[in-house]
Amino acid sequence: MTTPISNSPSSIPTVTVSTTTASSGSLGTSTVSSTTTSTSVAQTATTTSSASTSIIQSSGENIQSTTGTPSPITSSVSTSAPSPKASATANKTSSAVSGKITSQETSEESETQATTSDGEVSSNYDDVDTPTNSSDSTVDSDYQDVETQYKTISNNGENTYETIGSHGEKNTHVQESHASGTGNPINNQQEAIRQLRSSTYTTSPRNENIFSPGPEGLPNMSLPSYSPTDKSSLLAFLSNPNTKAKMLEHSGHLVFIDTTRSSFIFVPNGNWDQVCSMKVQNGKTKEDLGLKDLEDMCAKFCTGYNKFSSDWGNRVDPLVSSKAGIESGGHLPSSVIINNKFRTCVAYGPWNPKENGPNYTPSAWRRGHRVDFGKIFDGTAPFNKINWGSSPTPGDDGISFSNETIGSEPFATPPSSPSQTPVINVNVNVGGTNVNIGDTNVSKGSGTPTSSQSVDMSTDTSDLDTSDIDTNNQTNGDINTNDNSNNVDGSLSDVDSRVEDDDGVSDTESTNGNDSGKTTSTEENGDPSGPDILAAVRKHLDTVYPGENGGSTEGPLPANQNLGNVIHDVEQNGSAKETIITPGDTGPTDSSSSVDADADVEDTSDTDSGIGDDDGVSDTESTNGNNSGKTTSTEENGDPSGPDILAAVRKHLDTVYPGENGGSTEGPLPANQNLGNVIHDVEQNGAAQETIITPGDTESTDTSSSVNANADLEDVSDADSGFGDDDGISDTESTNGNDSGKNTPVGDGGTPSGPDILAAVRKHLDTVYPGENGGSTERPLPANQNLGDIIHDVEQNGSAKETVVSPYRGGGGNTSSPIGLASLLPATPSTPLMTTPRTNGKAAASSLMIKGGETQAKLVKNGGNIPGETTLAELLPRLRGHLDKVFTSDGKFTNLNGPQLGAIIDQFRKETGSGGIIAHTDSVPGENGTASPLTGSSGEKVSLYDAAKNVTQALTSVTNKVTLAMQGQKLEGIINNNNTPSSIGQNLFAAARATTQSLSSLIGTVQ
């Protein structure tokens, strides 16, 4: 039965294809018949093989190709019409394709022109020119009518080639000399496929008989040009015998390595319908690769292709489809990240039609799904050379077979954009490879780059869906698992893959799980530089999300603590306690902590999904919004594995951030609950209540829940801050850092829609993560506030105070200061407690003590002495000199235009690196570990003790007053507004002067 391809007008021919499988690895032969209403021509051609016409440099290997005895292959094209008829017949004795084919064109009118001769028909065809019209609906391929000529070249022991001559040029010479030949190239995709399928081949080691004799004279080994984005061009290129002589085989796939372009043409499983070109570049420098690296990358890709295709089609696609509530099959990942460093492969969304649309940007709350790519990192086999042969065509030219299943190979439904061929990118960065098959550009960086490669896979989807992945000899689509899918262009920037290796270690992780919370990174002097928060977060997440895929489809297990507790403990104490699974116990019920375990904080380990995206598209998605809070994933016994927190988070965010771009420039809108409440409810009850917008009502003001967003927004620290982006713009970034906390977006009425939390977060993270890669491999710098304070202030007050890097974290700023600035000085550390023999209990030890008969007051930075052990005595002369200038001998204040006391102290702090002027000593005289007062019968000891006591009291007073003065520069205002002897300013300086006198007395006594 012959079934038309589509309900096209009668002027469009009907094409039927007969395909049989030949022996010895042949991909089969095809007989094509066409019927139109215009003319009728039956032609059978006879040609012999010949060489092509120009020379190109080979890629360093001499590849020998042999062919067997050719068998006759006949192909007929018949038409019937009232016009005159003509026929031409010839015999074909080499393994080439003869005849011509007219194919169906859709969506645009197709015109066919044929020219025949009235006299004797020669062995070469007359010109037949057929305009090619693009197709965008149901036709699988863009076929073009061409004329083909063949010539003879002698076989002297090395190569026998099939040559396709130049297009549109009549050749009156049927046979010429051995070393030259002309003809018409095959531009018709179906014609090229028929020729390629008519060839059989065997493989042998690549270096076998490379020094065997070649043909006499100088054979023409030139290769034709091709377009990597046009499938028809690729097929015509591969059908050239010179090209076939240079093709290689690996793992059942056929490849042509083009060293001049740093690319390779890939024919998966020998299926010519799935041919595509892959551009390979260094991921960071965008430079082309050398031959060795190019072949290594090609071998790895060939080795893991079938494993990846099988795992995607059999496991990942059904899983993702069930979570999204859609029918499985035909869903491609937006991108695939292959990480050479951690030997993993992860595929990312979008998974549903809504997010795959052109006007929708997927949210940042999705996660990837790990896909098995096989053991491609344990070494790959070498390439094999291909020994080409030929196989006969079917004996009966009158038997024709047509495809009755519309949409399957070879007439698969083309994608929506036939004229634009998608580029599939494979990016190898930091030892990792990123395969980008969609419109998502995934960029990711790492602090320790090893090798970076990028592979660009270009296919022409005007004919077939070239993103169809299959593991067998596919007759159905291209690089896809089941059905067709939309393919779009995508380029990529430097990216780090946010994936997990076999041992569960992230690529930017500085320590393994057992060292979580420890100060692993060191400075030049070898001292630890700070707590490793990422390692602690990772260890906690590995415990509460034990799923095979990093828990992306499972809920968090109940534990003795949540992510908020872990981060808080590491920031405050330098390490976190061990996370222990406690069945039946869900841990603290305070929403402040439960929220911290929410969506995508685990992604912090690898700088989050959206880093480096050209279009700001995030990587992953667990479920759609309709399944929020439900236990969507199941284990092997069919029982639900846990609540789907990510879906609940996504649904809530879609409600309170209703903007076109995921609400990045809007809201959040006031609602009956916030993100903390949602996550808490899902963890506690398995589901969250519906989020309802309540105009006039704000979200919960409980600071615990607003700080909870730390977990989510820490993830934004790298993704939404734009680190690694090619254009420096994040997908959710609404404003620059200077506008942080402002109501930048406006609604229809022109009024601000809400505080811009993301901008404030971005500005804070840019300050505390100044590293080249967004600070992903560096600890955050100590500052006067953390991310939780930022979010809380913006939600409560509409703006956040300025983040200032400081050795100490501020003790809570007062935004109501005279100039609207919070304190830049850290809070004074609490007084240490020591056991004394006199009290035998906990008593406050003096901040200034005596060691070895010498008083030494040291400045402290983060609880330890600063390098060089700067003493307090170095500051005292500056203070005394300043006070002597501003006060007369009788104690009256003289208003000077010079620097103020606060400026002097601040300058000293900057020079020494001290966070504050804090007196401290290591030990005191007496028994070890005690603070024994210096009392005794000696009058000198008593006097010295009294002097030290006075100095301590004076230092405490002046320190408190200086700290107060520095907050908002109040000191200058007090002095300027109070000029009487009884003013507060005079009293303050009187106390400072008394302190100076006491200090001078103490220094003199000690010296």
From Swiss-Prot:
Belongs to the chlamydial CPn_0572/CT_456/TC_0741 family. PANTHER family: PTHR36975, TRANSLOCATED ACTIN-RECRUITING PHOSPHOPROTEIN. Residues 167-176 have a biased composition (Basic and acidic residues). Residues 1-96, 423-442, 469-491, 619-635 have a biased composition (Low complexity). Residues 118-163, 177-186, 200-210, 443-453, 507-523, 732-743 have a biased composition (Polar residues). Keywords: Signal. Residues 1-186, 200-224, 387-533, 543-562, 578-645, 655-674, 712-757 are annotated as: Disordered. The lineage of its organism: Bacteria, Pseudomonadati, Chlamydiota, Chlamydiia, Chlamydiales. It comes from Chlamydia muridarum (strain MoPn / Nigg). It comes from the Bacteria. This is Uncharacterized protein TC_0741. Residues 597-618, 712-730 have a biased composition (Acidic residues). Residues 1-51 form the signal peptide.
